Amino acid sequence: MNLLRPKLKYFILAILIIAADLYTKYLANTYLEFAQSVKITSFFNLTLLYNHGAAFSLLSNDQTSWQMIMFSTISLIAAIVLIYLIIKQPITEKINLFSFALILGGALGNFYDRAFQGYVIDFLDFHIGNYHWPSFNIADSAITCGVVILIAASLFTKKKS
């Protein structure tokens, strides 16, 4: 356990992301009407949607049980791999650890939805005029931020020789 103590904060970050994700999805599901936009700004709405597909609602028209099982399994495998990476990553690799924690929290937040509801709740709707970015949630944001940070770190940090 002493080996994991320095990495505990990264697991706590993942748990906080899961909690924020599930709580905001609960609020959206409780207070928003399905597919009815609530205008917040000229470029941002809250719009409750149920995503039966993958990221950006890919494959969402084909709502089959194999698809739910496949996406749930992929999320669970990703979470297991991320936990392993956090455990094995040197404590000095803080950017990687932070990124892995973001992705882990997001993967588990969306896994929960898929496993217990059969779909992921999306509600954040950004747009320019009539062009809407696909709706998303806190988990999606955490995953995206984690991946972007990992890519940026790999591109802009020098490897020690």
Curated annotation (Swiss-Prot):
<feature type="transmembrane region" description="Helical">
    <location>
        <begin position="40"/>
        <end position="60"/>
    </location>
</feature>
<feature type="active site">
    <location>
        <position position="140"/>
    </location>
</feature>
<dbReference type="GO" id="GO:0006508">
    <property type="term" value="P:proteolysis"/>
</dbReference>
<dbReference type="GO" id="GO:0004190">
    <property type="term" value="F:aspartic-type endopeptidase activity"/>
</dbReference>
<feature type="transmembrane region" description="Helical">
    <location>
        <begin position="91"/>
        <end position="111"/>
    </location>
</feature>
<dbReference type="Pfam" id="PF01252">
    <property type="entry name" value="Peptidase_A8"/>
</dbReference>
<comment type="function">
    <text>This protein specifically catalyzes the removal of signal peptides from prolipoproteins.</text>
</comment>
<comment type="similarity">
    <text>Belongs to the peptidase A8 family.</text>
</comment>
<keyword id="KW-0812">Transmembrane</keyword>
<feature type="active site">
    <location>
        <position position="122"/>
    </location>
</feature>
<protein>
    <recommendedName>
        <fullName>Lipoprotein signal peptidase</fullName>
        <ecNumber>3.4.23.36</ecNumber>
    </recommendedName>
</protein>
<keyword id="KW-0997">Cell inner membrane</keyword>
<feature type="transmembrane region" description="Helical">
    <location>
        <begin position="136"/>
        <end position="156"/>
    </location>
</feature>
<keyword id="KW-0645">Protease</keyword>
<comment type="pathway">
    <text>Protein modification; lipoprotein biosynthesis (signal peptide cleavage).</text>
</comment>
<dbReference type="GO" id="GO:0005886">
    <property type="term" value="C:plasma membrane"/>
</dbReference>
<feature type="transmembrane region" description="Helical">
    <location>
        <begin position="8"/>
        <end position="28"/>
    </location>
</feature>
<keyword id="KW-1133">Transmembrane helix</keyword>
<keyword id="KW-0378">Hydrolase</keyword>
<keyword id="KW-0472">Membrane</keyword>
<keyword id="KW-1003">Cell membrane</keyword>
<dbReference type="InterPro" id="IPR001872">
    <property type="entry name" value="Peptidase_A8"/>
</dbReference>
<feature type="transmembrane region" description="Helical">
    <location>
        <begin position="67"/>
        <end position="87"/>
    </location>
</feature>
<keyword id="KW-0064">Aspartyl protease</keyword>
